[in-house]
């Protein structure tokens, strides 16, 4: 079961592959088309496993940590697929049939972060017209993914640390605490250790989040995977545009 913070449930479409190779167009006979079999991925598991040394190392670390319940800090540049890695860790874990809740920490104003993370009860503040479950309660039994965790305010970091230490949350306006059984995955494109040294990120929270660290390689480190990625995106483009482009010329 995969859900994002907006409670969208992703279904699993039937994967398709490109099996054949043909010239790019009828008029281009100078170079044969170059084609690599498109990887089988789904919306539920969009991870593309490459053949480059960097990709193999990434897969090795994912397979190593996924069966455990350790917190994982996923580091990498923007656009390298940190959430995709988090989803794969979840799908390879014992929690695979439980919720996966992805939270963009950078998109949550600090004033409402407590409500977003821990929920609230009706009438607890102006605008609280109904009870609301927070992301932690929604992820109960499963995995919560805290994307761009370095963007949280210092106050919100304190609240998050307490929830992670005690595995209990208290919705705003409630007198009762709720026990939560969750695995925490976090991601950042920042150097959190540098942020700790500057006093912008709590050291105790940093150590709580990085029981295991995975660094997602950049595309420049995965040059051997380029044709695999190209084949995947070509297949998606064919599907969306209703075309039947079969491959790439050697020049391309």
Predicted regions and their residues:
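Short, solvent-exposed beta-strand edge segments and adjacent coil->beta transition regions
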Residues: 43-45, 211-214
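Conserved ASCE P-loop NTPase core motifs with emphasis on AAA+ ATPases
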Residues: 1-54, 60
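Charged helix-capping and loop-helix junction motifs
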Residues: 198-201
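ABC-type ATPase nucleotide-binding domain
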Residues: 87, 208, 212
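Conserved Sensor-2/SRH helix of P-loop NTPases
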Residues: 225-230, 234
């Amino acid at each position: 079961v995969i859900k994002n913070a907006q409670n969208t449930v992703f279904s699993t479409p039937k994967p398709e592959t490109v099996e054949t190779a043909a010239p790019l167009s009828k008029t281009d006979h100078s170079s044969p088309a170059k084609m690599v079999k498109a990887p089988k991925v789904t919306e539920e598991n969009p991870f593309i496993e490459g053949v480059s040394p960097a990709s193999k190392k990434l897969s090795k670390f994912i397979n190593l940590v996924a069966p455990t319940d350790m917190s994982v800090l996923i580091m990498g540049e923007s656009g390298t697929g940190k959430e995709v890695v988090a989803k794969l860790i979840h799908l390879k874990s014992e929690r695979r049939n439980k919720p996966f809740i992805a939270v963009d920490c950078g998109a949550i104003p600090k004033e409402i972060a407590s409500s977003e993370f821990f929920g609230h009860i009706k009438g607890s503040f102006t605008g609280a017209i109904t009870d609301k479950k927070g992301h932690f309660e929604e992820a109960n039994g499963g995995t919560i993914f805290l994307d761009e965790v370095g963007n949280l305010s210092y106050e919100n970091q304190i609240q998050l640390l307490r929830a992670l230490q005690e595995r209990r949350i208290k919705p705003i306006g409630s007198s009762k605490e709720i026990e939560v059984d969750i695995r925490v995955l976090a991601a950042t494109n920042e150097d959190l250790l540098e942020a700790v040294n500057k006093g912008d990120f709590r050291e105790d929270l940093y150590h709580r989040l990085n029981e295991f660290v995975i660094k997602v390689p950049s595309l420049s480190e995965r040059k051997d995977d380029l044709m695999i990625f190209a084949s995947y995106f070509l297949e998606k483009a064919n599907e969306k545009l209703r075309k039947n482009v079969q491959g790439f010329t050697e020049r391309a």
